[in-house]
């Protein structure tokens, strides 16, 4: 078949145009990496990124191609396995992956549990990014926002406070039941008179130091302090002594996982606002405790 000069020139022009203007389809896009996602997070937290922080890639390689993202409160092996099964190879966790706040791994180099966990992550090309300090430091605090929403307490929030709420004399037992049911917490513990009318609640999601707790509980208007976890020989004893001395006070200990879980559920929604290339989902960390029947 003969080729005319005109058709030859037309074909040449098409080839040149394709070279100058490559397809804008997915094949022309650079793969989304874990480092890309982390950079987008840094660009959108709305605060300067701290030089000293636990918010780092703690497992895997930053240049790993991301196939899907899972947010979670704690990157336990169970969470990592479920994320891998769902095809989510970037796990964004609020709490540590390696058993200490700093995610220090050296003490566990020869530990069987650590080795099993890291081997699984390597096998499934997984990356874990810790997102703790800046998620709390944002305004609003991502954990506090998610928890208030999950509990249905947005309307009770005190103006200019992310962690204080007002109620109309709700009995302590009723409020404790509400917290247990709405958070799906199995092991909520309560200190105080079940009939105590609660008008003002102060909350600390996660762990709270006694040096901060006692300043809050000492305020006359605060009836109830809600916390994820605390030391029994500090905050718990202090509240018991306040009650024994005639003060109308109460304490609810939810458990660390249940007390921050909804904040990382919200994190998945937040990420979808600027990461659209891959699926994103929240993977709940299982509550570790159970209570034997009496």
Go through each PLM region and give its residues.
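Hydrophobic structural segments
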Residues: 2-294
């Amino acid at each position: 078949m003969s080729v005319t000069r005109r058709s030859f020139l037309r074909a040449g022009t098409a080839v040149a145009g394709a070279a100058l203007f490559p397809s804008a389809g997915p094949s022309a896009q650079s793969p989304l990496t874990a480092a890309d996602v982390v950079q987008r997070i840094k660009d959108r937290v709305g605060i300067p990124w701290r030089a000293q922080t636990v918010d780092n890639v703690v497992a895997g390689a930053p240049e790993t191609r991301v196939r899907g993202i899972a947010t979670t409160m704690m990157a336990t092996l169970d969470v990592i396995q479920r994320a891998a099964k769902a095809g989510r190879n970037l796990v964004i966790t609020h709490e540590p992956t390696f058993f200490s706040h700093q995610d220090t791994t050296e003490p566990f180099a020869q530990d069987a549990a650590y080795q099993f966990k890291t081997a699984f992550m390597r096998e499934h090309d997984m990356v874990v990014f810790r997102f703790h300090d800046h998620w709390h430091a944002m305004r609003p605090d991502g954990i506090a926002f998610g928890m208030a929403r999950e509990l249905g307490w947005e309307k009770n929030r005190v103006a200019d406070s992310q962690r204080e709420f007002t109620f109309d004399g709700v009995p302590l037992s009723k409020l404790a039941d509400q917290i247990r049911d709405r958070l799906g917490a199995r092991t909520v513990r309560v200190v105080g008179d079940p009939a105590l009318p609660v008008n003002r609640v102060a909350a600390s999601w996660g762990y709270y130091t006694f040096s901060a707790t006692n300043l809050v509980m000492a305020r006359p208007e605060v009836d109830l302090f809600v916390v994820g976890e605390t030391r029994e020989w500090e905050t718990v004893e202090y509240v018991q002594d306040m009650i024994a001395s005639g003060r109308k006070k109460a304490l609810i200990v939810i458990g660390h996982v249940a007390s921050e879980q909804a904040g990382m559920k919200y994190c998945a929604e937040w990420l979808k606002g600027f990461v659209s290339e891959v699926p994103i989902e929240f993977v709940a960390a299982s509550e570790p405790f159970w209570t034997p029947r009496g």
